[in-house]
Amino acid sequence: MRNLILVGPMGAGKSTIGRLLAKELRLLFKDSDKEIELRCGANIPWIFDKEGEPGFRDREQAMIAELCALDGVVLATGGGAVMREANRQALHQGGRVIYLHASVEQQVGRTARDRNRPLLRTANPEATLRTLLETRDPLYREIADLVVETDERPPRMVVIDILERLQQLPPR
């Protein structure tokens, strides 16, 4: 197995499920946002404030290219990673892509108290999440080998579902 790459909106459970999946498969877990923070010595909101979203996306693109070149990694990506064609290509070529789908209602509940999400610093975070999902959902689906629903499911059950469904995929 090369890599397992988790894509999906914020609040879908990419980091939580990614850690569990990596532990189960005895693989290394990487979170592209956390890796950017470690490399920069600053958190994502600070990078957004100082460099804007384009500056952050440039850093993200470089990090995704680097992480997708590894072998034996479970990679959790940021929700907007799929917005750039270069990222979609790197993710698709980097391993099996798993789209963790979550409804806007679930995303709202899971992100409500998280201050580390610059795109949700709006008057109406739910409307923002809805707009983001409408824009990004087709891009997640474009590169996904699997689409896995996370609504109302404990992370452990999602991991079991992923493992079972991965075995059914034909080699590529």
Curated annotation (Swiss-Prot):
GO terms for molecular function: ATP binding; magnesium ion binding; shikimate kinase activity. It catalyses: shikimate + ATP = 3-phosphoshikimate + ADP + H(+). SUPFAM superfamilies: P-loop containing nucleoside triphosphate hydrolases. GO terms for biological process: amino acid biosynthetic process; aromatic amino acid family biosynthetic process; chorismate biosynthetic process. Transmembrane segments: none annotated. Keywords: Amino-acid biosynthesis, Aromatic amino acid biosynthesis, ATP-binding, Cytoplasm, Kinase, Magnesium, Metal-binding, Nucleotide-binding, Transferase. Pathway: Metabolic intermediate biosynthesis; chorismate biosynthesis; chorismate from D-erythrose 4-phosphate and phosphoenolpyruvate: step 5/7. Belongs to the shikimate kinase family. Monomer. Catalyzes the specific phosphorylation of the 3-hydroxyl group of shikimic acid using ATP as a cosubstrate. This is Shikimate kinase. The lineage of its organism: Bacteria, Pseudomonadati, Pseudomonadota, Gammaproteobacteria, Pseudomonadales.
